[in-house]
């Protein structure tokens, strides 16, 4: 699996370098993309601190809202991996403000809300749990609206819990 992952990472890097050379872009855009590419590489290797540094530099240089949305989304992924769910939600939300067509951000927000609902149940607070589950349902519905047929487990959960309309 890691060999295949490394092959994909190397392929991405080669393609990215070719694109940087042939697509007309400003030097700032090229520099931003270079930081983004380096951030993705570090993230795929589990070097989250290095990835964040690269993403923050890319954010400083990148002006296109669509491109910024993917940088913000990846920052959210890192915070999710680190268990920093509040920060992750903030970054996913900021990504969606710039690009409302990121079903993966809606899905990840739903997963975090669902997890928090399960935590609330374990703590004996069913009212708080229901609020988290309702929020998870809203995010999953948005993800499913954007990509019908994806997120099958979420779709089934929505049906089973009576949250699917």
Swiss-Prot record:
SUPFAM superfamilies: TPR-like
Gene3D superfamilies assigned: Tetratricopeptide repeat domain
Keywords: Chloroplast, Membrane, Photosynthesis, Plastid, Repeat, Thylakoid, TPR repeat
Record field: transmembrane: none
Membrane topology annotation: Peripheral membrane protein
One GO CC term on file: chloroplast thylakoid membrane
Subcellular location: Plastid, Chloroplast thylakoid membrane
Family annotation (Pfam families): TPR_1
TPR repeat segments: 32-65, 69-102, 117-150
GO biological process: photosystem I assembly
Family: Belongs to the Ycf3 family.
Function: Essential for the assembly of the photosystem I (PSI) complex. May act as a chaperone-like factor to guide the assembly of the PSI subunits.
Protein name: Photosystem I assembly protein Ycf3
Organism, as annotated: Spinacia oleracea (Spinach)
């Amino acid at each position: 699996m890691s060999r295949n992952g490394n092959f994909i990472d190397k392929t991405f890097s080669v393609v990215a370098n070719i694109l940087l050379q042939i697509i007309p872009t400003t030097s700032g855009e090229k520099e931003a993309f270079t930081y983004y590419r380096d951030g993705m590489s570090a993230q795929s290797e589990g070097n989250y601190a290095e990835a964040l540094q690269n993403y923050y530099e890319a954010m400083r240089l990148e002006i296109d809202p669509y491109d910024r949305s993917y940088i913000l989304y990846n920052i959210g992924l890192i915070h999710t991996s680190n268990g920093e769910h509040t920060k992750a939600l903030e970054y996913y939300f900021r990504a969606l403000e710039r690009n409302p067509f990121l079903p993966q951000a809606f899905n990840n927000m739903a997963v975090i809300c669902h997890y928090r609902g399960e935590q609330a149940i374990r703590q004996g607070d069913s009212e708080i749990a229901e609020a988290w589950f309702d929020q998870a349902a809203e995010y999953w519905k948005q993800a499913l609206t954007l990509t019908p047929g994806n997120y099958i487990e979420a779709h089934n959960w929505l049906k089973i819990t009576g949250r699917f309309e």
